[in-house]
A protein has these predicted regions:
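ATP-dependent adenylation/nucleotidyltransferase module used to activate substrates
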Residues: 1-179
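ATP/NTP-dependent adenylation/nucleotidyl-transfer catalytic domains that generate, transfer
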Residues: 158, 170-269
Length: 269
């Protein structure tokens, strides 16, 4: 069992928002108090490498946070399309500016309640066998430093890691279920969920919607999830609405080309 429960972890550290990477970046920004305006300074700088160096001197020991906010690497090179920057979620920087969070953001509840207990259990074993599958996506589909082969490897500390299900596809899994008449948990078979993780975790983009699916069966669970993660659910809804409005605005601007005349612009004689 974890030394710290989910409720205490969230109270002490904060609530996840959008993704673990986004949560870590925003947690650092909140703790360090770095102004969002550094992103504008970097964007407007002619010499971005020099500006990045200057920001590093102005805000020491904040390298990852500077890179996160400015969407760049430590050399000052723009990196707008990688997962480690704030705008990996479209318009997130502008949204945070216009609607700053009134709660602490963090994904450390995952470390406290899942990762640390797992590490404590597995540290004395020679081999660690886990059930990750590549088709689950996310970090599980990306090669890791200790596991370039993905299915089997030896780590730097002498342990072996084995993922026997890694190359089992969703199609394989469906065949196996039908062939052997396997019944999934009620979460899938009755409640209608497509994938589960920590109950109510806001990292899932449809966490709040999934809670409504299980409300008729688990009303107390739904109530508890809202008490723990509710601020993140509401903030996610605000962000989704903001993103939708911005995308519609951009689409409208692209349709209206400056200088282009329409049929109704011509004066009838």
């Amino acid at each position: 069992r974890p030394k710290v429960g989910i409720v205490q972890a969230v109270r002490e550290h904060g609530v996840p928002f959008v993704s673990k990477i986004m949560s870590a970046g925003l947690e650092g920004w909140q703790k360090k108090g770095i102004p969002l305006s550094i992103a504008d300074e970097y964007a407007q700088a002619g010499d971005k490498a020099e500006k990045r160096r200057e920001l590093g001197e102005r805000f020491p020991k904040c390298e990852s946070i500077i890179n996160f906010l400015c969407c760049c690497n430590s050399e000052g090179e723009p990196r707008p399309d990688i997962q480690l920057v704030i705008n990996s979620s479209k318009y997130m920087l502008d949204f945070i500016r216009e609607c700053p969070p009134d709660f602490q953001i963090s994904a450390q509840c995952c470390d406290c309640c899942k990762k640390q207990p797992a590490y404590n259990v597995q540290k004395d074993y020679e081999m660690i066998i886990t059930g990750e599958r590549r088709d689950e996506g996310g970090m599980r589909s990306v090669p890791r430093k200790d596991n370039t082969a993905l299915c089997f490897t030896e780590t730097s500390d002498g342990q072996y890691r084995f993922r026997p299900l890694y190359y089992v596809t969703d199609r394989d899994k469906a065949w196996y279920k039908e062939r052997f008449g396997i019944r999934y948990s009620d979460a899938y078979e009755i409640y209608g969920l497509t994938r589960t993780g920590c109950c109510g975790c806001p990292v899932s983009y449809k966490a709040a919607d999934d809670l409504e699916l299980i409300r008729p069966y688990e009303p107390n669970v739904v109530k508890a999830a809202w008490n723990i993660f509710g601020k993140s659910y509401e903030y996610r809804r605000k962000y989704n609405a903001y993103k939708k409005a911005r995308m519609a605005e951009e689409k409208k601007k692209k349709a209206n080309v400056d200088g282009q005349m329409e049929l109704f612009d011509f004066i009838e004689e």
